Amino acid sequence: MSDIALTVSVLALVAVVDLWIGNIKVRGVGFGIGGVLFGGIIVGHFVDQAGVTLSGDMLHFIQEFGLILFVYTIGIQVGPGFFASLRVSGLRLNLFAVLIVIMGGLVTAILHKIFAIPLPVVLGIFSGAVTNTPALGAGQQILRDLGTPVDLVDQMGMSYAMAYPFGICGILLTMWLMRLIFRVNVEAEAQKHESSLANGHSLIQTMNIRVENPNLNNMAIQDVPILNSDKIICSRLKRDDTLMVPSPGTIIQAGDLLHLVGQSTDLHNAQLVIGKEVDTSLSTRGTDLRVERVVVTNEKVLGKRIRDLHFKERYDVVISRLNRAGVELVASSDASLQFGDILNLVGRPASIDAVANVVGNAQQKLQQVQMLPVFIGIGLGVLLGSIPLFVPGFPVALKLGLAGGPLIMALILGRIGSIGKLYWFMPPSANLALRELGIVLFLAVVGLKSGGDFVDTLTQGEGLSWIGYGIFITAIPLITVGLLARIFAKMNYLTLCGMLAGSMTDPPALAFANNLHATSGAAALSYATVYPLVMFLRIITPQLLAVIFWGMG
């Protein structure tokens, strides 16, 4: 059997063992994709014992390509919501998550100096303790750039594997500890979270208002400042028994009922100007109007602003809401359409059908993957990661590398959405498949390379001390920030659990947090809010630590 065939066969065996281990769960919690690493270590140990030689160049390529696939698909997935997560609504959560990252780096630096832990080993412990695989890849790459021998770079995978198990368990124990210390009632926390959403500024709501302000009588909607803004959409107007779709030029009269869509504060401000909120239904039922959701799939409208499509003027149809990547937005006239956007349309059936034809509304296209943008994005990401950033006093130039470059490029492209006929939307199933394939390939190779010396290191070497160092790196930041967030910021417990899981970019921890309450989305929301920024910082941190420690000797 050729080296290539043998290498592929061993990798396939590793993947089978890995995924089997990952599916083993105790009380609903398992290693998940982290099981791939341990399967690779097991197979790698026996491969080494048998004296089997695998293709080193092929293993290196598979490892790097797997990492690229993984981080790129993550960036495409979270890109549409990344920049939104940095706004004020998520600022507090991101600050706490960043504090966890910084504290983890400081603890790592202190342990390195006090115990003289070799640089590859301490970076591996750090990556495993925070359960972040791209950090492992970024650390290995910067070490190679610094001229570290290959056998020492491979030690990083071993120390990563030593610290990884408690990295998973540590965050679960922290959640349990917070619940015990503060005697948390999970059901009450879920209700508080729902109440805060209802009273907050993040949800799109509706309000029916009767026009009672005499100053607005016989004025066009576009001449009323509160209605001619990007914060409020007037999607229906009822006059006497007639329900209509208003246009900017529609004249409003005293007694008209307006159906407004926007955030609660903006709706309240509109009510103060216009008149009185009423309970009268403005439902399209029993009228010649209807409400329908359509999806944007036509390349010809991608990147175009809603105002430039003239749906109201041409078809007498209003877009009342826009859903992008699961987030409900006010369909402002300046909003640009992206592939996969879901539009809430109000109008007559024939008119809605006409608008649906314009925007596409081809459900089958949502399941298709444009491969050209995928490889363009990966290529640009690799180029971005290769750009050197020279910092005075540092022995080598900093780079985003193969972990950071594709991630940042994917975040940017995911946010842009489309350029001409190219769009970077990827169906969730396809994204998940590529992401899982990438991480399986990467961790399988890391495990294979580490497996030969893993058992000896654990039983006869410093494996136990590495585990101890990892416990400190995991526990100290999580417990400290958890206490600060709960005591001083009065953070909701479920939100806190999601933030802790997101700060470690740990899906098993998110699964545990979600299971704390069956119906609350608090944990998932906070996890998604901090995940993009934390993932970027987790990739950069080992590179900074490596360069700083290398320069200090």
UniProtKB/Swiss-Prot annotation:
Record field: transmembrane: 4-24, 28-48, 65-85, 95-115, 158-178, 371-391, 393-413, 437-457, 464-484, 493-513, 533-553
Localization in the cell: Cell membrane
MF GO annotations: monoatomic cation transmembrane transporter activity
Keyword Thylakoid: no
Main location per the UniProt record: membrane
An individual GO BP term: potassium ion transport
The protein's name: Putative transport protein YidE
Lineage of the organism: Bacteria, Pseudomonadati, Pseudomonadota, Gammaproteobacteria, Enterobacterales
